[in-house]
């Protein structure tokens, strides 16, 4: 059963989190620390700020914010913060208005219970069927569906069946077909169907194959010899299928999936479709779902002693125990002994028999003992001098990890599924990746749904076949498997990876275990914290900790490797949650002044907007959900700074058109929702898979675009005497290079730009009668009139900007 000591929903995508003390603002009294220890309950609450400057101040505190930061009619801004009661009090002390609670830990407990119930129900159904099939008169195989349909004149038979032994036996089932009414079964040939396993639970066998004639009846014989027959039904077309045909298959998601289950799904897909897909093990293994065993003895900062095992918890550290004992005699020396897995510290006493050992003395004694230091490391509490007297007590060391043994404790490979008929780098590439942030459970489902659609629709849907034939698609369902497992099994609010970079003089003790890790989406090497940009932290316990250096983490290094080693990748989607945002670069700015990374050109910005419109329209098609214009655009415009994010890496370092989904309105919503427009992981997986598939259509259209743009000059009266206002109008998203001195335009000429943030094209004011020469070029490199800007061509566009009559 999944769960955790601090189960909780709704946490962050590109978010700003801190577990470190924030120093006092102006005033004589120190402010309460903004800090959260393991075991504290957290909730999502509203924080209302006066304006964007106050939002930046809120971000600067390091409080854990989700992506909701929406403007109110009165000009204020409502943000959502993930806080404990103590953190809420600390925000109030800093002058912030903390409002109502939106989500609490019970929400995620309900989500996990829903997942457990779904899995248990499926297991029970399998067991019930297997038990019933033991009867001589009941077949151990049953046919669920047998559908015939055509696509572009080609006939297909799709079959779903359940086998009583399907939970433990991976054998395929063979289907025999007749050739139509009155013909013999077997005369129409055979086809195989394979197991569909989700979250470790067998659901059914499924598959589709081309058939020359429509069968009327099919038969399945199980490995035990039992049989089942069924009539074949016609699969009827439906209206409103968008770009895809009536036979398009979707909805392959039945529950939330842990990282292990995500990888199992893509491995199974690659094994089932070896001609179209392969698994790529990325070069950098994670640190692993593992920790050293720890104990913390004492009750105050001055007398606490931290104990860490030298071995990993699962490799023996969890077997250790420590005891601080009173020797029961006066004038006893401080001593340390080890018997097997038990460490005993006999505390020093004075002439009256009172304990005199301080925390610092106990730490020094343990670390000086060869036997003790071979198995543990001791330290005072968070940099304390350790001058408090130690109390008698004992503890068993624990790594605090609750996942079942099926979750590996070793350094974890990160896997991508690479999909395409041709996967040698010669086709344009698309990259989709999810779960940079551990607690975002819905985005990985979007990647699985997309992979399933691409592979299962290849045979019968012409549009899907075009995509798979034309593109080289990389899908990483979980960038951060360690953090993902920790979020499912231990601390549902976990945002970062699991690597502890905190020194023993800092927050390295057992109480701080839920605040360790690096924010993978702040660890990249483009417009990062280390470059002076805002929205990341140097604190090892901050939710936006950028790491000790750029690309220090294997999780971020893997994404950089994919982009660097595959220059054919031209488009990318980073899937996060939540907030229903759709964003692109620039994603970082420097303070003061919000000086952003370089903005895309007008042509690039226009292309981002145009492609986004297509993608968002397909998302809306599923159930009518619209991502609003206010939540669409560059990250720096619609949200706040996220220094060192992967979108900026892909766009600025590698020239990849890179977007960021923020899926849904909650981070761990119910899987199903009775409200058809409500928060639902299932519905969100479907609607955002629509958008991800549309990105692939955008990529294909980009590659096959050979249409040259056209453009014209629009002249209007100017407020300045003797001057005119000039704008360029293009037939599509295109860059315009122009001159106003009569010279030939080249790529070194002035580039027509935007008027400002989210404003559209600029207006150029020139003297009436100015000769303007120009050409346009679209995102695919098609130049207007086939003009050669760097050659001897003279067929550029030209006009005289005369005052309108």
Question: What role is predicted for each listed range?
Answer:
Residues 312-338, 367-372:
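Ser/Thr/Gly-rich low-complexity blocks that favor extended beta-strand/coil architectures
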Residues 182-197, 329-339, 745-749:
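Low-complexity "stalk/linker" and mucin-like segments enriched in Ser/Thr/Pro/Ala/Gly
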Residues 730-732:
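Short glycine/proline-centered coil/turn motifs in the loop regions
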Residues 1-27:
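Secretory targeting and sorting signals
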Residues 174-176, 735-739:
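Beta-strand signatures of extracellular beta-sandwich domains
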Residues 333, 337-338, 741-767:
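Extracellular beta-sheet repeat scaffolds used for adhesion and glycan interaction
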Residues 27-306, 310-317, 348-725, 756-759, ...:
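M14 metallocarboxypeptidase catalytic domain recognition
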């Amino acid at each position: 059963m999944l769960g955790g000591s601090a189960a909780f929903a709704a946490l962050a995508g590109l978010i700003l989190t801190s577990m470190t003390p924030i120093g006092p603002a102006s005033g004589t009294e120190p402010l309460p620390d903004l800090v959260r220890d393991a075991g504290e309950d957290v909730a999502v609450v509203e924080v209302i700020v006066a304006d964007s400057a106050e939002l930046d101040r809120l971000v600067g505190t390091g409080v854990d914010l989700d992506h909701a930061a929406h403007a109110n009619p009165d000009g204020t801004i409502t943000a959502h913060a993930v806080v404990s009661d103590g953190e809420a009090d600390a925000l109030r002390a800093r002058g912030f208005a903390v409002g109502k609670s939106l989500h609490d830990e019970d929400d995620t407990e309900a989500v996990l219970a829903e997942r457990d119930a779904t899995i248990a129900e499926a297991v029970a159904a399998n067991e019930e069927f297997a038990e019933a099939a033991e009867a001589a008169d009941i077949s151990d195989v049953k046919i669920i569906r047998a559908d015939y349909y055509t696509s572009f004149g080609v006939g297909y038979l799709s079959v779903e069946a359940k086998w009583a032994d399907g939970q433990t036996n991976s054998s395929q089932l063979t289907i025999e077909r007749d050739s139509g009414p009155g013909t013999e079964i077997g005369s129409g040939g055979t086809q195989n169907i394979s197991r569909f396993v989700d979250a470790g639970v067998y659901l059914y066998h499924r598959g589709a194959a081309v058939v020359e004639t429509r069968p009327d009846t099919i038969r399945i014989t199980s490995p035990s010899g039992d049989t089942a027959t069924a009539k074949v039904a016609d699969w009827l077309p439906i209206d409103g299928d968008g770009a895809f045909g009536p036979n398009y298959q979707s909805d392959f998601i039945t529950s939330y999936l842990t990282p292990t289950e995500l990888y199992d799904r893509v491995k199974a897909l690659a094994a089932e479709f070896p001609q179209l897909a392969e698994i790529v093990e990325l070069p950098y293994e994670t640190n692993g779902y593992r920790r050293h065993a720890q104990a913390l003895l004492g009750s105050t900062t001055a007398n606490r002693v931290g104990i860490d095992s030298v071995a990993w918890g699962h490799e023996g550290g969890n077997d250790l125990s420590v005891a601080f004992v009173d020797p029961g005699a006066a004038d006893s020396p401080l001593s340390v002994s080890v018997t097997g897995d038990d460490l005993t510290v006999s505390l020093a006493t004075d002439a009256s028999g009172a304990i005199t050992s301080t925390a610092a003395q106990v730490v020094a004694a343990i670390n000086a003992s060869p036997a003790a230091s071979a198995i543990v490391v001791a330290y005072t509490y968070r940099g304390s001098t350790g001058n408090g007297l130690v109390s008698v007590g004992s503890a068993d060391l624990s790594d605090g990890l609750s996942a079942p043994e099926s979750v590996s404790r070793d350094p974890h490979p990160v896997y991508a599924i690479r999909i395409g008929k041709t996967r040698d780098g010669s086709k344009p590439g698309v990259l989709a990746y999810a779960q940079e942030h551990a607690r975002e459970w819905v985005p990985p489902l979007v990647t699985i749904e997309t992979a399933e659609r691409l592979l299962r629709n290849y045979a019968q849907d012409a549009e899907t076949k075009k995509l798979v034939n034309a593109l080289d698609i990389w899908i990483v369902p979980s960038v951060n498997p360690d953090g993902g497992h920790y979020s499912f099994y231990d601390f549902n609010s976990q945002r970062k990876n699991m690597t502890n970079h905190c020194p023993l003089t800092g927050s390295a003790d057992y109480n701080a275990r839920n605040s360790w890790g690096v924010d993978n989406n702040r660890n990249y090497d483009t417009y990062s914290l280390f470059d002076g940009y805002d929205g990341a932290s140097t604190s090892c316990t901050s939710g936006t900790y950028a790491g000790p250096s750029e690309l220090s983490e294997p999780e971020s290094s893997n994404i950089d490797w994919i982009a660097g080693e595959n220059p054919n990748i031209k488009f990318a989607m980073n899937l996060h949650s939540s907030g229903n945002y759709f964003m692109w670069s620039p994603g970082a700015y420097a303070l003061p002044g919000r000086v952003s990374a370089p903005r895309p050109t007008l042509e690039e910005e226009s292309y981002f907007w145009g492609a986004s419109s297509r993608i968002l329209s397909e998302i809306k098609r599923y159930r009518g959900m619209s991502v609003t214009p206010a939540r669409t655009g560059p990250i720096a415009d619609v949200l706040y700074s996220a220094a060192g994010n992967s979108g900026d890496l892909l766009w600025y370092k590698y020239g990849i058109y890179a977007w960021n989904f923020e899926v849904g309105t909650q981070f761990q919503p119910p899987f199903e929702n009775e409200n058809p427009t409500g928060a639902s992981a299932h519905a969100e997986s479907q609607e955002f898979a629509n958008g991800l598939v549309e990105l692939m259509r955008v990529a294909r259209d980009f590659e096959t675009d050979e249409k040259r743009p056209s453009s014209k000059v629009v002249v209007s009266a100017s407020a300045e005497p003797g001057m005119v206002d000039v704008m360029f109008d293009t037939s599509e998203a295109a860059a315009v290079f122009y001159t106003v001195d009569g010279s030939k335009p080249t790529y070194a000429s002035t580039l027509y730009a935007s008027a400002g943030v989210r404003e559209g094209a600029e207006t150029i004011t020139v003297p009436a009668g100015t000769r303007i020469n120009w050409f346009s070029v679209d995102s695919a490199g098609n130049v207007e009139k086939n003009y050669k800007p760097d050659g001897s061509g003279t067929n550029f566009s030209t006009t005289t900007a005369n005052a309108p009559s």
